């Protein structure tokens, strides 16, 4: 089909050439020939427009030849009906098209994409998809050859575009030979130059300027009289471009070879005040009176370049530190001739907590000073970037440089960093990769190592880490599936909570368990963070709340029937759940549905979950208490313990972390810490639960200290709900 179209195009071009040779003027475009052009290319209209002076008001266009399918209006464009193009105003798109046509550019498009006058004009005359080819006579815009098709989705093929360009060239040749171009008066030519939005500069084959329009005067700062006859190299070409310009110009004069002729290129140009600016340039060659003339159309693109550079800064630079961001760092690396030899990733573990707890006034100096420290320690030829909110990466090109930098860094970061009169101790992880490779993969592997390493240490990447991360991903996908389908693989177990004084069973803590068919039992310490990282901790938490409240309600129905006091249930909330906007309403509805009084439900949060977004956490805890639920701070003493926060937190219960209780019998310091915690909590009006009670000795000490409740293996491990419901009223120590 493509060959047939090309053959048809060649035949019609032959007809055009034959008619032009016979007629010698524009009468060659007979209705019959125009109809055959239209049929060959499936057109609905073929027209020729001539531009001319519109009574001193600018350039107008008149349709001098028109063939159209039946039913289409005739575009009778008189001097008064077409808006003239003036330097002071006019339709912006029309002015832009005029500038493009002066440069000899083809214009294609669809009426639906136009605006202003052109949209109204084209719509009125039924134009759908169009192509206009300028008719250039002696390098000047005489008019334009126009075609359009009714197909709104038509894409002009290379064969079609070349054919119409050839037809326009044939018409230009006829006009040049017949002298018809004289219809465009000197006044019209002057008007075209003066209304151009581009600087138009014409030079002869000696490089001397022979024309300089108003736009050129405005852009370059020269007057027309001051530059006519002077070489371009003395007026508008920067010194560092002169040699290149001369060589290219001489080569073109000698051989016709030129890399910029009739192409849109970006160059630098020189103003009268000596400043250099970026410009967009198109050059055409034409002959007049035996002379070779070169018309340059120049546009100042300073604003565009400034915007482009600003966008590049946004795209490739971290605004806080001025370092490359992740994309920018990889861009720098791929621009190097050789592959990097290694990478170091530094992760600031505490940055998120510092930001939410103390604000950007504390966090930003930490980030900036860390960036400065890395910049000062940067190995030769290395690249540095901030590749994440709390992550910096150094990519090295010298063998061994990554490991050496990491060793030096870890030693330096054990000391405080000072900035703005503040001292920071950073909890960090360092991941190191030492092998030649693509920067993308080096960064990925170093990040794996940084995530896996212990605080304050560095870890070299090893291949088994990839398998571990793959397993973690598989676990995350499996967990997501289990939560979505609510299969029996997920279950709740319940650990007893007793009165420390009497040993009487008062309730349970609900603990989620997952048994994977592929991986076996999976620790909550592994899968709960996976749920939080994967974005489905809220769904998991909703299931836990529903299941735990249902279980406790069932126990209490039976206990009430036997005249026994109700048990309470303690439910852990994650950092994700505590900021969920529908949490309070879900809790209220679930308790109401199962008939469990709010006084029987306690919600536990760790210190780190609270400090993630403290203000929202405090509001959530207050609203839970307003429902009638109790609230507890879990694992107290292991996180970011802050007395100021503890004073503000709407908490009823303080749970002492098991690490203090386990050491309490043999370690006087741990014992003293526990005593202080109990006294402090009681002083704040809070009751105390001690976790990790495994011996009668520990229980006895807690009783003496006045601890309210105890939880641990001494009273029982976490157990299924049906087993928990059968426990006796008092749990005698079993250990």
Curated annotation (Swiss-Prot):
CDD domains: EAL, PAS
Domain EAL stretches: 472-732
Domain GAF: 25-175
Domain GGDEF: 342-464
Superkingdom to which the source organism belongs: Bacteria
Biological process per Gene Ontology, one example term: regulation of DNA-templated transcription
Domain (PAS) ranges: 185-255
Ranges for domain PAC: 263-313
Gene3D superfamilies associated with the record: 3.30.450.40, 3.30.70.270, EAL domain, PAS domain
PANTHER family named in the record: BIOFILM ARCHITECTURE MAINTENANCE PROTEIN MBAA, DIGUANYLATE CYCLASE DGCP
UniProt protein name: Uncharacterized protein AZC_3085
Organism: Azorhizobium caulinodans (strain ATCC 43989 / DSM 5975 / JCM 20966 / LMG 6465 / NBRC 14845 / NCIMB 13405 / ORS 571)
Taxonomic lineage from the root: Bacteria, Pseudomonadati, Pseudomonadota, Alphaproteobacteria, Hyphomicrobiales
